[in-house]
Amino acid sequence: MENFPIISLDKVNGVERAATMEMIKDACENWGFFELVNHGIPREVMDTVEKMTKGHYKKCMEQRFKELVASKALEGVQAEVTDMDWESTFFLKHLPISNISEVPDLDEEYREVMRDFAKRLEKLAEELLDLLCENLGLEKGYLKNAFYGSKGPNFGTKVSNYPPCPKPDLIKGLRAHTDAGGIILLFQDDKVSGLQLLKDGQWIDVPPMRHSIVVNLGDQLEVITNGKYKSVMHRVIAQKDGARMSLASFYNPGSDAVIYPAPALVEKEAEENKQVYPKFVFDDYMKLYAGLKFQAKEPRFEAMKAMETDVKMDPIATV
């Protein structure tokens, strides 16, 4: 079995740039996932985020989760649970408008820490998109512009905690799915594992590493690259021992962004008679995804293709 791709991002600025770009290319084409070290976000920032996130769960969310488990009688289930996940979550919006000031129960210091962390993640996401452009032969800024819409991208963080689960064989931490959006940056617990991706028909563990950022590609990048890069099914396995923290930050297209395969890539694919992906408004895709998240992505693409005659093709905004 191949090793999960772990990439030292600082090497794109040195003599190992070509080899590092090739590693990113291979990860995008063959895994849909990779793990970044030396990515530029200071370790002390990540340590503070982790400490405050775990503290917030203990203080404000742990008891609510226990009450939910009791109300659903989840600890006594005898058959596989297919309609809910063993996770405690809340969501922070950063772009186009932040909701961090409005989210209840957050200490002011935690709000400031998360604002700072979000800015660093936004910068990293945009840096990665440009590296993907370079590997794809697209002009710098193409993917950011493709995501832009009229108000800029949507960017937010899903903050999750996965408490110890008494029946991990029957309840998933998070059921298998692909991510609907663009590029996802995950800061996960380095002590408790659980994240797995599907590759060549096998579930593979994503290794927990201290101070790393796990990157995965969403459905929109599969469409824009016309299938050259793929979004990949992944899931979280609940654990009997240990609580797992996960902060997944989604850098997604703006709600009114029109998503379609990059013409330069379609021309290359056309020569090989490969199928062209659909064109659609991102918000329309999200409405469809809401009811089909835990199903295969291909029927979603087919449904959008059936609707695409109604989509106006506007030129990509320039930022």
Swiss-Prot record:
Cofactor: Fe cation
The keyword Oxidoreductase belongs to this UniProt entry's keyword annotation: yes
EC number: 1.14.17.4
Keyword set, alphabetical order: Ethylene biosynthesis, Iron, Metal-binding, Oxidoreductase, Vitamin C
Binding site for Fe cation: 177, 179, 234
Pathway annotation from the record: Alkene biosynthesis; ethylene biosynthesis via S-adenosyl-L-methionine; ethylene from S-adenosyl-L-methionine: step 2/2
GO molecular function, one term: 2-oxoglutarate-dependent dioxygenase activity
Domain Fe2OG dioxygenase: 153-253
EC primary class: oxidoreductase
Catalytic activity: 1-aminocyclopropane-1-carboxylate + L-ascorbate + O2 = ethene + L-dehydroascorbate + hydrogen cyanide + CO2 + 2 H2O
One example of a Gene Ontology biological process annotation: ethylene biosynthetic process
Matches recorded under PANTHER family: OXOGLUTARATE/IRON-DEPENDENT DIOXYGENASE (PTHR47991)
Family note: Belongs to the iron/ascorbate-dependent oxidoreductase family.
Protein name: 1-aminocyclopropane-1-carboxylate oxidase 1
Source species of the chain: Petunia hybrida
